[in-house]
Amino acid sequence: METTTKKARSLYIPYAGPVLLEFPLLNKGSAFSVEERRNFNLSGLLPEVVESIEEQAERAWLQYQGFKTEIDKHIYLRNIQDTNETLFYRLVQNHLEEMMPVIYTPTVGAACERFSEIYRRARGVFISYPNRHNMDDILQNVPNHNIKVIVVTDGERILGLGDQGIGGMGIPIGKLSLYTACGGISPAYTLPVVLDVGTNNQQLLNDPLYMGWRHPRITDNEYYAFVDEFIQAVKQRWPDILLQFEDFAQKNAMPLLTRYRDEICSFNDDIQGTAAVTVGTLIAASRAAGSQLSEQKIVFLGAGSAGCGIAEQIIAQTQREGLSEDAARQNVFMVDRFGLLTDRMPNLLPFQAKLVQKCDNLQHWDTENDVLSLLDVVRNVKPDILIGVSGQTGLFTEEIIREMHKHCPRPIVMPLSNPTSRVEATPQDIIAWTEGNALVATGSPFSPVIWKDKVYPIAQCNNAYIFPGIGLGVIASGASRITDEMLMSASETLAKHSPLVNNGEGLVLPALKDIQVVSRAIAFAVGKMAQQQGVAVKTSAEALQQAIDDNFWKPEYRDYRRTSI
């Protein structure tokens, strides 16, 4: 739908002088007009020339290019974000493909590990366990009253890097940057939060620079009571919030999601977002091959909350395509460090127990091993799709990939572990081991592979294709919950934007330069499904689209008018 461009209304603000220059959401730096400089007591506090935001962005781009390491580029961009958010997002949107890996994965992993070392300025909310009884007061200290999206972590499972304590704050900050850059959600509506419940990372506890609570992690009832205090305080302060759980440990991620998804509008991106983008990718890949996902055999390496979340969404999709639940589950094989999940395996977590294979169905397998390894599974299942969410590097060996290719002419291989140092196999190796026949999608960004003089672009199965659009759709529709069907609609919409499906060539996922188009489409699909599911007020399609347009923030300066506090 075409939209008309109209001039943004002036902002009436009470701040002036150095205070205004220190306010990242409002600071324009050298772009304050002559009149604004006079009205807001800025005369003489800025260089003479009044610049446009594009001139500022060009200077920032030149400065950015002067940094040689990715972590230095990350620090530089974070400094701009903490100084002038509008400029930060204009710069990032101008160079999204270059900068997304710098503001988020994989560089954000190093930033989390070095959080206390590279700390410059506070952003977001830090809630430590010793302050648990001051939760309401802490949230009242947040200056932005109209918060609509919170990303919260406890720092225990940061990417594939494990316990980073309050260093995990880098993840909510980076994630919310993508909500804005990709999904058009105003930075004024976003809030990163870290729940500081201690750390079991001895290196951090021994680090004199570590800025978090120096205490072993609280667990069990103490932990869940603390999280519940936080949830109740958030509901009191912002009843209509969208809350995203991020990088919680496996033992807590699924229980927290199960407990709160029907109490507050919430989702877990590691479980549901990863599942949605993976299923969208697989739907597109299957259609490009002239088949359906329900016709594929799928093997997972990694049976944690993320892997099982993906598996359950695949099962739901294949049921939509016509399989019975039992048949759908028989097509999915989960392998963890103890081997294939079977109905005779002890000590399975509840979400794993639904994904076991029955040992009676495996008696004909060609193996003498009691523990069924990934190679055993690949050799006997002859899968079409291999997905890695193990967080361990190098586990997709040459023998395993060649064995898969022996029975599958066009294997789909998805090493999704983050960051790049934890990937199960590199695209270069997978392409070589399959004689150039594999369709590869990764969790972290990789450069195109050149093999035998042919270029193979590598799709990044990035959650940023999904969660910004979900957030925009929830805000625009006023959805009170995020349902499984809303996530399915996001996957289906992503698949519809596949260049490989639509053009018969190219990447299985859209180019990052088109991610705002994809986010808008996902927002509409999610909002429409929310209305159909009864978790949002029904409106016309035109009204929903208008709400999406109205809520889509652009990094442009607005005129300021002076008002009193």
Curated annotation (Swiss-Prot):
Active site residues according to the UniProt entry: 104 (proton donor), 175 (proton acceptor)
MF annotations from Gene Ontology: malate dehydrogenase (decarboxylating) (NAD+) activity; metal ion binding; NAD binding; oxaloacetate decarboxylase activity
Free-text cofactor note: Divalent metal cations. Prefers magnesium or manganese.
Enzyme class: oxidoreductase
Recorded catalytic activity of this chain's protein: (S)-malate + NAD(+) = pyruvate + CO2 + NADH; oxaloacetate + H(+) = pyruvate + CO2
Subunit structure: Homotetramer.
Cofactor: Mg(2+); Mn(2+)
Native species: Salmonella agona (strain SL483)
Descriptive protein name: NAD-dependent malic enzyme
GO biological process, one term: malate metabolic process
EC number: 1.1.1.38
